[in-house]
Amino acid sequence: MRHLLIFFALLAACGATSLTAVAQDSAIATRPQRLLYVAAPGIRNYLEYGGHGLVVFDMNNGHKFVKRIPTGGLGSDGKPLNVKGVCASATTMRLYISTIETLQCIDLTTETLLWEKALEGGCDRMSIAPDGSVLYVPSFEKARWNIVNGDTGDVIAKITPDSGAHNTVYGLDGKWCYLAGLRSPLLTIADTSTHTASRTVGPFSSSIRPFTINGRQTLCFVTINELLGFEVGDIVTGKKLHRVKVTGFQPGPVKRHGCPSHGIGLTPDEKELWVTDGHNQHLHIFDATVMPPTQMTSIKVRDEPGWITFSIDGQYAYPSTGDVIDAASKQIVTTLTDETGAAVMSEKMVEVQFENDRIVRTGDQFGIGRVLTADGIPKSKTAP
């Protein structure tokens, strides 16, 4: 009898182990394919930081190099131009790359360039509507934003804040688009139903550089010239709320951008705010659950960071240095390298998720907050 009990116990254990293995295999099989698309040259036109093209990494497999997709964006001399922005749509399954002169549209299912158009005034860092129908494309540090049809690339409207057009963020609900110029202390808010400037936030203490917003579009967090840190604005009232300086570090000369902090991002759950520090080659992390946010810790990275964004689920932080950081532990888990083993660094990258060869979800080149309701559930740009 005792031998029978032992036999059945072993049989049950083996069955449980098998079921666990099957469940694990099933979970892996049903997990979306997560790819990180990195547009290069994404630090000025420096080819030593990743060459030219769309460099793809497997987020589910240690961020290993997958492939390089050829892109356009060549100048009259045949050399690659500075990439200024990247965005993608799960609905249309298209990815867009802006350079200082042109806007490119790539079909991600065929990995072919559908069109490339030179927009009047050039291009800077754009943003795409949640349904992929429209892009707000800033001219290259000039007066206006071109509103572009996502299908054809045709300009359908223009907004002219005359602010030195530079950075653009679409709200998650698609109703508002946020326009920042590098020669203005005001953040312009566009009504996307009419493609007109509706109101502003600020003035902030100096011209706005990279910025971000929370999911409910009640707060903006802006970096500005001459500040190692950031300021906070109330999108509802239009007023500046707080000025927050990084402590324990001193600003100094930087190789690019001309400002101490050129990069800021909210984690998708909006619990943390990450700010770049070029001179000291650090990321500074703040507790965003309190106002004003309070400084928590800092992370040393391998080069001067000029941007920061996050994976859709908030698992990874992606500074422009190519360091891949586990956002929870604050540890660098790997670095991006291309097919030759060379380091890849870029300020222009976006996550795209696939299921059954179809795009189901896209991230954002900006580290935007994704909490839409009091339940604290983040949202991504998901195909219908």
What are these regions (language model features)?
Residues M1-L4:
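Positively charged n-region of N-terminal signal peptides that target proteins for export
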Residues I6-S18:
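Bacterial N-terminal signal peptides
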Residues C14, A23-P384:
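Predominantly soluble domains enriched in secretory-pathway, periplasmic, or organellar proteins
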